[in-house]
Structure formats: C-alpha cells, structure tokens
C-alpha cells in the first residue's frame, strides 16, 4: 500500500450539470484527498497536446472538440494506491457498463461524455499532473 498522487479531470458534461460537488464527494468518500483543484477552459492546443497519445485514433477530433466545449475541473488527488482507487470509483469508460455507485454510472451520459478522466498509470499521472500543475499549486 503506497501513497500516490493521481490526476483527475471533471469533464464539461458534469460541469454543465453542476455535478462538481457530488463528484468530489465520491472521490473523498473513497479515501482520496483533493490536494489541488482548478477550473479552466482548455484551448484546442492544450487538448490536442494532453490527448496526443490518441491522435491517430478515429475519435481524436471529437474528443478534442468535446473537451474544449466547456469548462473542466483539473485535480490532483492523493491517497493510498490513489491511481487504482480513482479508477475504481470512476468506473468503466462506458457508463452503461460501469458498476452501480461509480461516478460514470451515476453521472456519465455516454462513452465520451462520461463525466471524468483519471490517470491510468504512474507514468500517466506524473505526466498529466505536470501538464497542468506547478508543484507550488499542490497543497498537502
């Protein structure tokens, strides 16, 4: 059991439906601590760079268009095995396949508009946190 940091992004569909507080409650009730959080509109360039690993995938352009369609909430989460724990509380990518009680099952609307993104590995968490946050923005 290792203390880890992970990255989370509450997506535009959840922001538009005023679900930030409810999603934060799910994260905190699961044992994750929010140590950094900010709201912003991603530029097309930021979105393309952030999702660069998906550039060759057929959904890349619609993903960039969606993620820039409204504000997002960027977060750094801390906790014991935070990456795995966050993935568990988020649920399956497709809300129709997610377990009851997960963020995506309870708030997601579609595979793309599934309310939340979370890092899938330690390398991804490091890259994603550093993409959006300076060390001085992470408050223990």
From Swiss-Prot:
Question: Which residues are recorded as binding ATP?
Answer: 11, 59, 87, 93, 104, 114
**Keyword Nucleotide-binding listed:** yes
CDD domains with a match to the protein in the record? NDPk_I
Q: Does the keyword Iron-sulfur apply?
A: no
Keywords, in A-Z order: ATP-binding, Cytoplasm, Kinase, Magnesium, Metal-binding, Nucleotide metabolism, Nucleotide-binding, Phosphoprotein, Transferase
Q: Which Gene3D superfamilies match?
A: Nucleoside diphosphate kinase-like domain (3.30.70.141)
Catalytic activity entry:
a 2'-deoxyribonucleoside 5'-diphosphate + ATP = a 2'-deoxyribonucleoside 5'-triphosphate + ADP; a ribonucleoside 5'-diphosphate + ATP = a ribonucleoside 5'-triphosphate + ADP
Kindly state a single biological-process term from the GO annotations of this entry.
CTP biosynthetic process
Q: According to the UniProt entry, what is the EC number of this protein?
A: 2.7.4.6
Taking the first listed entry, what is the main subcellular location of this protein, grouped into a coarse class? Answer: cytoplasm
Cofactors needed by this protein, per the record, are: Mg(2+)
State the source organism's domain of life: Bacteria
Cellular component GO terms, alphabetically?
cytoplasm
Where is the protein found, in the record's own terms? Answer: Cytoplasm
Q: Which residues participate directly in catalysis?
A: 117
GO MF annotations for this entry? ATP binding; metal ion binding; nucleoside diphosphate kinase activity
NCBIfam families hit by this protein: PRK00668.1 (NF001908)
Write out the similarity annotation.
Belongs to the NDK family.
Q: Which HAMAP family match?
A: NDP_kinase
What job does the chain carry out?
A: Major role in the synthesis of nucleoside triphosphates other than ATP. The ATP gamma phosphate is transferred to the NDP beta phosphate via a ping-pong mechanism, using a phosphorylated active-site intermediate.
> PANTHER family, alphabetically?
NUCLEOSIDE DIPHOSPHATE KINASE (PTHR46161), NUCLEOSIDE DIPHOSPHATE KINASE DDB_G0292928-RELATED (PTHR46161:SF3)
**Subunit description:** Homotetramer.
This chain belongs to the protein called: Nucleoside diphosphate kinase
Q: Give the species.
A: Rickettsia canadensis (strain McKiel)
Q: What is the lineage of its organism?
A: Bacteria, Pseudomonadati, Pseudomonadota, Alphaproteobacteria, Rickettsiales
């Amino acid at each position: 059991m290792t203390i880890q940091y992970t990255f989370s992004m509450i997506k535009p569909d959840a922001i538009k439906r005023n679900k930030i507080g409810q999603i934060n409650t799910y994260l905190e009730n699961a044992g994750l601590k929010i140590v950094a959080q900010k709201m912003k509109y991603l530029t097309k360039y930021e979105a393309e760079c952030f999702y660069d690993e998906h550039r060759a995938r057929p959904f890349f352009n619609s993903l960039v268009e969606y993620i820039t369609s409204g504000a997002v909430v960027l977060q750094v989460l801390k906790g014991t095995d935070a990456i795995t724990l966050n993935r568990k509380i988020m649920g399956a990518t497709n809300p129709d396949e997610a377990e009851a009680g997960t963020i995506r099952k309870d708030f997601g609307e579609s595979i793309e508009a599934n309310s939340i993104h979370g890092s899938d590995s330690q390398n991804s968490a490091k890259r994603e946190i550093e993409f959006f946050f300076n060390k001085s923005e992470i408050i223990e």
